[in-house]
Amino acid sequence: MRPLMAGKRRKDILPLEEALRAQSAFARTLRTWEGARRAAVRSATVRARRRGALPSSQAAAAPRVSLMEVALARYGLFDKDAAGACAEYARQRRTFSIHSRRGRRKLRTAVPEARLDLHGMTCSEARSALDSFFAQARERLLQKVEIVHGKGHHSKGGSVLAPSVKRYVQAHPHAGELFHPAERRGGKGTTWVLLKRSVPLH
């Protein structure tokens, strides 16, 4: 049996980083088309209202303009691959909207994909470790990480590291939701972080 990639030439196989850049660029193009579609709908609705053909109460019923129609009107071309990609993008967006809450609830209880233990570090050392940790997590496209900072029982004047970690995570551009797990998994001595998606809809 021939290997799955046997018919592929080596130069046709994109490195991961290049493939991700291409996907991000395509996603930006689709977002541009989506913005143009919405602008076209708004413009058509305003013109119809001015003509008296569309009462305000019926504005929501205005006909929708597809992404491909906007692309054809603007660029005057038709590409079957692009049409298929637009349809797939719309399907993924609907699926993501339906399942995002369900997926987030599931992710909240899932086991973290990486762990950083900050015990014994100063706040300055912890920030440096966190910088490296989040950079690696983003490169690996992780969705959930665990940061162990302790409860500060052995610190004079109360916990110092935990508040510092919280401020760092809240200000980090790639960090999303953060929360403490159940006591049996570390409780307030541990912070779980859901990372923001680095590649849209993927």
From Swiss-Prot:
Pfam families documented for this protein: Smr
InterPro entries given in the database record: Smr_dom, Smr_dom_sf
Superkingdom of source: Bacteria
Annotated Smr domain residues: 116-196
Protein name as it appears in the record: Uncharacterized protein TP_0674
Organism: Treponema pallidum (strain Nichols)
